[in-house]
Amino acid sequence: PDANTGVIGYFNIPSRNWMYEDFFFEELMPYVESKYRIKSNKRFRAISGLSMGGGGTITYALHRPDLFSAAAPLSAATGSLDIDKSIQRLNSFGFKYNRDEVRSLLKSNHPLELIDDIPLNKLNSVRWFIDCGDDDYLYEDNSLLHIAFSDRGIILEYRVRDGEHNWTYWRGSLPKVLEFVSQSFHQF
């Protein structure tokens, strides 16, 4: 969603007039559900993405567990909770954010910030499938998610296979993701 806009991410950033999450839930989803013959309730809705889209997948499912029966992030880019590291990483991609913007983004969107404030029954109303390659540069972040989810009592499938942050790895994951999502539609 960055598309050379000078902002990055699937989240609302009011200071940058970037309301991507609102667009996703208030415009894109209703449009898709009105245009195509699909069932538009939680029981038949899942979300999945890879890399930055994997980070968006987790956060959207945490923000709106009432909407998704399953969430399947692959190689999720969640970033560091350390403000200085986050600023450095954003700068490396050419994005300039100040400390207050980064602090606000982390507090309202980072999964490790969110899971303690959501009732466990809501967290477990979503079936979780987290998958990341053991040579992926995001492996540590995904491992920390797995540990935090497990410590919180969130039921999840966590998969680590040989692989990097690339399409070769993700293509190998897609059959399992589709099977997992399909099974999620039959859980009710």
Model-predicted regions and their roles:
Residues 1-188:
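Non-catalytic cap/lid and distal C-terminal segments of serine-dependent acyl enzymes
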